[in-house]
């Protein structure tokens, strides 16, 4: 009996260390000045590609926040975490909505994650939504918020977020999809890129999937309504139809997984991407990792 108790307490101790010790031992403070190399999400994808026999290169180009189009920054905040500068890591309204949807559907599908939570997951954890991983994510989110500035959290997120198979970070995404640096993304291009973040392997910013059309339309509409879009785009806007907010279509998801709910909009004709050539005259760090 005594042996069983010892085994039980050892098991509990190991479990608690895995649950709490791992996220507490990670060196989060190094992120103040150092850019992470391979993230947990990148490693996870590399294992997937190896298992599937795919030869995929990780394309990532580090870029400072001040070299990213303000339209892209605003579009991502609108799409993923509109309360980013107001909360301390958690959007409890978003979590409440996610829980209600999970209970309604009977499975852990929605997470209500903020940008800080997504960064914690991308850097250190697996994509799993099991309770243990969510607790670890919460601990890491608190540590990130207490250690890093909001500006640095946003900069890290935009540089490690997944934007397609092997494409990580906004600079690599801007060059891959639009042939330009992230600094020169237009409002419409920014809206399209932000729209696919919830599931970048399923959705393509250059495609015509109804979900992407509606979500990017919404993001663009909000940017216009808030006065984010500058005057030079007014002539282009005059050529488009008036923006309206229709009722959501029956079979179309109103929001992406892991983000607070948003309404949907009707599609808008896509603007042609600028022909400006990609700029490489600022401090960037390009990384290509080929899956063995």
Regions found by a protein language model. Give the residues of each.
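Juxtamembrane regions of bacterial inner-membrane/periplasmic proteins
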Residues: 2-292
């Amino acid at each position: 009996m005594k042996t069983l108790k010892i085994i039980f307490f050892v098991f509990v101790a190991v479990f608690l260390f895995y649950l709490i010790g791992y996220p507490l031992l990670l060196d989060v403070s190094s992120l103040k000045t150092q850019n992470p190399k391979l993230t947990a999400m990148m490693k996870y994808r590399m294992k997937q590609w190896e298992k599937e026999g795919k030869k995929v290169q990780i394309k990532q180009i580090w870029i400072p926040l001040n070299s990213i189009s303000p339209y892209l920054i605003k579009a991502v905040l609108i799409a993923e975490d509109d309360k980013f500068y107001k909360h301390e890591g958690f959007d409890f309204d978003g979590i409440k909505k996610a829980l209600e949807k999970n209970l309604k559907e009977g499975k852990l599908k929605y997470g209500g994650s903020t940008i800080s939570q997504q960064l914690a997951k991308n850097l250190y954890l697996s994509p799993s939504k099991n309770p243990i991983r969510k607790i670890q994510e919460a601990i890491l989110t608190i540590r990130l918020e207490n250690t890093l500035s909001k500006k640095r959290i946003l900069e890290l997120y935009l540089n490690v977020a997944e934007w397609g198979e092997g494409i990580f970070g906004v600079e690599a995404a801007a060059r891959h999809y639009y042939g330009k640096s992230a600094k020169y993304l237009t409002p419409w291009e920014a809206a399209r890129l932000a729209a696919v973040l919830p599931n970048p392997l399923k959705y393509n910013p250059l495609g015509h999937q109804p979900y992407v059309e509606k979500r990017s339309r919404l993001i663009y509409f909000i940017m216009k309504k808030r006065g984010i879009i500058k005057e030079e785009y007014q002539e282009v806007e005059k050529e488009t139809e008036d923006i309206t907010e229709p009722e959501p279509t029956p079979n179309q998801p109103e929001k992406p997984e892991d983000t607070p709910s948003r309404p949907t909009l009707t599609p808008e004709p896509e603007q042609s991407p600028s022909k400006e050539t990609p700029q490489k005259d600022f401090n960037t760090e390009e990384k290509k990792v080929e899956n063995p």
